[in-house]
Amino acid sequence: MIKLINAKVITSKGVSNNKCVVIGNEHIIYVGDDTKHMQCDTIDLKGNYVSAGFIDLHVHGGAGSSFMDYDQISFKKVVKYHEKQGTLNLMPTSLTAANNEIYRFLELYTQMKSNDSVKDSLLGVHMEGPFLSTNKCGAQDGLFCTKVDVDECQKYLDKCSDIKRMTIAPEMDEGFQLAHYLRERNISVSAGHTDCLYETMTKALNSGYDMITHMYSSMNGITMINGFRNAGAIEAILLNDDVCVELIADGKHLPAPIIELVYKLKGKDNIIFVSDAMRATGTDAKESYIGK
């Protein structure tokens, strides 16, 4: 057994200082005040934190590799890099690309799902695109953004039975047909990379869209049209009590007051911090292009 002492332990109840954590047989068997009578190998954390492993629902790559490199070595490299940063479970996320590249990504994921070295880390696939707005493609390749095609989506599902989530621009989903199709198959539908305004987003949130992909990034807030202010997608999201939102809380994508605002309006149970990490994460690269 291993005993961690002088730890700041993060639990669902908050942070507890100067606590002891005992680990045995790869399980946490005790958390509390120091148990000096227990014979264990002891590690003094000197006030450092102990936390449950992180979960990342939106991650493309890291350590110089991408999940869409289409080889097992790169796939493992990404998973192991994030594991070292404390992320024990993640959702490999695709990029908008040509369909043959998306097929290869889905086929590779299916192979890795049975790979002993990474299978316990995988939570399913998050498909980000290709049904995104070309006006709000952000770092995605707008060349491959396209309107919703349910038949094409079924081909994705045929390639991989573990697709758990798909990001779609609601205005690209006429009548929200794909949202209904996916929800019938217990797949989460996330609004993102969207050029829509308040009315369309409100309808989407009432028609199966249950998550928001990297809120504020690649979407509209208050928009001036013909000299008048119009509520945007962001206002629709903030006024909806049920939808969960992603935030990239890296101190770069969003300033602290924005995160504080979302927390005040959405509450902790409807906010998901994600990395949206790409291949340059964890490297010394000064320039990097997503997907390349």
PLM regions with names:
Residues 53-55, 190, 273-274:
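Residue-level marker for buried hydrophobic side chains located in beta-strands
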Residues 64-69, 92-101, 171, 218-230, ...:
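Active-site loop-to-helix "anion-binding N-cap" substructures in soluble metabolic enzymes
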Residues 200-292:
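Active-site-adjacent C-terminal substructures of enzyme catalytic domains
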